[in-house]
């Protein structure tokens, strides 16, 4: 999805901001009232597991999925059991809640839940009401931690820890609430969560006692049709390629390819787009097509042999992991 350019301009640069500002103020006020009501008398917790919400206050991609992958692997490495709940955004199923496996159809349950099931090999449940998804997890598993993919503003779900993801390139935009700007709620919300994680950026500028930096380190390319096939990261340096991305911030992916020395003709698609084979008819079939792992999940059924996705490794500082595990009540975490 392409976001309005005036969201990322100063108010003086766009008359649209001034026109929509009163509506944005109302959205901020309603969001603040909902939060106040939740803090005063929120829903009772239905699980003994620690519920960790990974959300954002800015619309669009911010790196929630790779951070959840990082967190899940940290939990596994330290012997903690976990599951993931999600709304299943973009899923067309009429039956909720439901389980998600690595073989689930993204068009039915959403692309991100399928990707998390494939990459983390953990139980995943989806429902527009995340409390129902948690109950489904609890019906079968005794978990230490439940991770909520998004859901910061989903106040039907009780939680123990709130983590907000932020894009270090787009920041808060013009700092106005929808529709005048990109914020779901006031920037003051950042001061009320447990941690803020910046996707990329300079640690000296963004890191603090309650915030940290996540780096996405390119590892290699995997075949979309056969993920067991791997190519070195340098494979496409001297080759003309196509690249596509249907994520919240496709330019970030295209910039990464450029930094790797890859010359690509790029095509952005809407976030969460349900791809069909006809969407790729305009791409030159003789050129390799590069994409993100999230896109690959939705293209595997009709992928061509020269389609590849970039696998990245999300990394956060060990000091942050120590803080987070301490917050979870696991004081024996060792760096």
Swiss-Prot record:
Catalysed reaction equations from the record: a lipid A disaccharide + ATP = a lipid IVA + ADP + H(+)
UniProt pathway: Glycolipid biosynthesis; lipid IV(A) biosynthesis; lipid IV(A) from (3R)-3-hydroxytetradecanoyl-[acyl-carrier-protein] and UDP-N-acetyl-alpha-D-glucosamine: step 6/6
One MF annotation (Gene Ontology) recorded for this entry: tetraacyldisaccharide 4'-kinase activity
Record keyword Flavoprotein present: no
GO biological process: lipid A biosynthetic process; lipopolysaccharide core region biosynthetic process
EC number per UniProt: 2.7.1.130
Pfam family, one: LpxK
Top EC class for this record: transferase
Keyword terms of this UniProt record: ATP-binding, Kinase, Lipid A biosynthesis, Lipid biosynthesis, Lipid metabolism, Nucleotide-binding, Transferase
Alphabetical list of InterPro entries matching this protein: LpxK (IPR003758), P-loop_NTPase (IPR027417)
SUPFAM superfamilies assigned to the protein according to its UniProt record, in alphabetical order: P-loop containing nucleoside triphosphate hydrolases
Binding site for ATP: 58-65
Entry GO CC: plasma membrane
Task performed by this protein: Transfers the gamma-phosphate of ATP to the 4'-position of a tetraacyldisaccharide 1-phosphate intermediate (termed DS-1-P) to form tetraacyldisaccharide 1,4'-bis-phosphate (lipid IVA).
Family: Belongs to the LpxK family.
Protein name (Swiss-Prot/TrEMBL): Tetraacyldisaccharide 4'-kinase
Lineage of origin: Bacteria, Pseudomonadati, Pseudomonadota, Gammaproteobacteria, Thiotrichales
Gene: lpxK
């Amino acid at each position: 999805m392409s976001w309005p350019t005036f969201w990322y301009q100063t108010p003086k640069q766009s008359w649209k901001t001034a026109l929509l500002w009163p509506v944005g103020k109302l959205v901020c006020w309603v969001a603040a009232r909902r939060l106040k009501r939740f803090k005063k008398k929120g829903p009772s917790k239905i699980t003994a597991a620690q519920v960790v919400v990974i959300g954002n206050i800015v619309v669009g991609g911010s790196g929630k999925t790779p951070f959840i992958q990082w967190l899940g692997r940290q939990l596994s490495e330290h012997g903690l059991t976990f599951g993931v709940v999600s709304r299943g955004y973009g899923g067309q199923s009429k039956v909720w809640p439901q389980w998600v496996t690595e073989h689930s159809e993204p068009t039915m349950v959403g692309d991100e839940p399928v990707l998390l099931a494939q990459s983390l090999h953990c139980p995943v449940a989806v429902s527009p009401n995340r409390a129902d998804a948690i109950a489904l997890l609890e019906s079968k598993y005794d978990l230490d931690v439940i991770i909520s993919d998004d859901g910061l503003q989903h106040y039907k779900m009780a939680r123990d820890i709130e983590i907000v993801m932020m894009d270090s390139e787009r920041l808060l935009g013009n700092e106005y609430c929808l529709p005048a700007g990109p914020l779901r709620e006031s920037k003051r919300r950042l001061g009320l969560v447990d941690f803020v994680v910046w996707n990329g950026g300079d640690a000296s500028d963004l890191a603090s006692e309650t915030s940290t930096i996540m780096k996405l380190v390119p590892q290699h390319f995997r075949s979309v049709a056969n993920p067991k096939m791997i190519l070195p990261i340098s494979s496409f340096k001297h080759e003309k390629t196509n690249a596509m991305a249907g994520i919240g911030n496709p330019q970030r992916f295209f910039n990464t390819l450029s930094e790797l020395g890859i010359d690509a003709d790029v095509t952005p698609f809407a976030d969460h787009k349900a791809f069909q084979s006809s969407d790729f008819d305009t791409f030159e079939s003789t050129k390799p097509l590069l994409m993100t792992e999230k896109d690959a999940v939705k293209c595997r059924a009709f992928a061509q042999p020269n389609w590849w996705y970039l696998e990245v490794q999300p990394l956060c500082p060990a000091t942050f992991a120590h803080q987070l595990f301490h917050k979870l009540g696991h004081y024996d975490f060792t760096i």
